[in-house]
Design a protein with these regions (language model features):
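A short, conserved alpha-helix in the catalytic core of glycosyltransferases
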Residues: 164-166, 172-222
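Short beta-strand-to-loop acidic/aromatic patch adjacent to the donor-nucleotide binding site
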Residues: 81-93
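Glycine-rich, basic loop-to-helix element that forms the pyrophosphate-binding segment
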Residues: 61-80
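Conserved donor NDP-sugar-binding/catalytic core segment of glycosyltransferases
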Residues: 93-129
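Short, flexible, basic/aromatic active-site loop/helix in glycosyltransferases
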Residues: 134-171
Length: 251
């Protein structure tokens, strides 16, 4: 039985970038398995499964959404009684040893439901991905209000920048780009909300886990995220972001 399963949701991604994420996860002495869950309109990425025998490729033949696609793999992990499931973005990469350190910390702290390492840009700068619980007003104002000083002050508070990001913290909201999840916690609080097609599904899940377990930022380990704010570039994606914020606030 694997010690850790992981899932990467695909949607017409670049194979070169995906290969870095895949190789990062599989470069471990732990017993692992990786699900590639493909939401693309064709299966041109299926040959990625030939990289390693520990990969299982799932083609949905439709864009089911981020959370729904990850849930397909998470349910398999739960059915297989795997202790941990890693939700992994396709633009993440990291050195050997990262999984071992996170696995060990989770094994020694059974009250943790989700753990996130320190996440860096490719140039080495910190990505401030520890968050307070947002409201729809926060999300909309941070996107549209032109007052730079006001936005910066609000962002500093919202992203917990005063903490220095140099100590272990129990944080209400952790990023969905790398969610190292305890499957027993997921059985307790539920999986991704499939009513949220895109954006804030990670916020919602992190919030629910945080009500019963610790959700830990662990800066002793670091990974790299080739991050891009896609919702800022696309009106359609921004619409999904706002709809998700409104839906979450109505729960």
């Amino acid at each position: 039985m694997p010690q850790i399963n992981a899932s990467i949701v695909l949607y017409h991604n670049k194979k070169e970038q995906l290969a870095k994420a895949i190789e990062s996860f599989l470069n471990t002495n732990l017993d692992v398995k990786l699900y590639l869950v493909d939401n693309s309109s064709n299966d041109e990425l299926k040959d990625l499964k030939s990289i390693d025998s520990r990969i299982e490729y799932i083609f949905n033949n439709a864009n089911l959404g981020y959370g729904t696609a990850h849930n397909i793999a998470i349910k398999k992990s739960i059915d297989e009684k795997v202790s941990y499931h890693l939700v992994l973005n396709p633009d993440i990469y990291f050195e050997s040893g990262v999984l071992e350190k996170l696995y060990s910390y989770m094994q020694n702290n059974s009250d943790i439901g989700n753990i996130m390492p320190n996440i860096l840009y490719p140039n080495g700068e910190i990505q401030y991905l520890c968050k307070l619980l947002p409201t729809p007003v926060d999300l909309i104002l941070r996107r549209f209000i032109p007052f730079k000083n006001w936005k910066e002050k609000r962002n500093n508070t919202y992203e917990l920048k005063a903490s220095g990001y140099d100590k272990i913290m129990n944080v209400p909201v952790l990023s969905g780009c790398f969610m190292f999840l305890r499957t027993s916690a997921l059985k307790d609080v539920g999986l991704f909300d499939e009513n949220i097609f895109m954006y804030l599904e990670d916020t919602d899940l992190s919030r629910r886990i945080h009500t019963k377990y610790k959700t830990i930022f662990y800066p002793k380990v670091q990974i790299t995220h080739e991050y891009a704010k896609e919702s800022y570039k696309s009106k359609k994606l921004l619409k999904y972001h706002i709809q998700s914020a409104i839906y979450r606030s109505e729960e």
